[in-house]
Amino acid sequence: MKVVLLECLVWMMAMMELVSCECWSQADCSDGHCCAGSSFSKNCQPYGGDGEQCEPRNKYEVYSTGCPCEENLMCSVINRCQSA
């Protein structure tokens, strides 16, 4: 039973690694994505679409909880993307 649980855990970690792309800066991410996360674990995440969580753009391009919004959208005071 322990072996099965360990195999499941390893499989889940491998899948998470495939889905997310680790990054150190914006330059590590492809177009339409930003580098966001904690100081120890940042991943390339897509820019926010209409109604999705966001962080306002900043000159340092440092984001912790999510990316800025896609073009033509703005990040509202409640951190949701909406029409500009």
Curated annotation (Swiss-Prot):
Localization, UniProt: Secreted
Family indicated by similarity: Belongs to the AVIT (prokineticin) family.
Tissue: Expressed by the venom gland.
Protein name: U8-theraphotoxin-Hhn1a
GO MF annotation, one: toxin activity
Signal peptide as annotated in the record: 1-21
One CC-aspect GO term: extracellular region
Keyword Disulfide bond on entry: yes
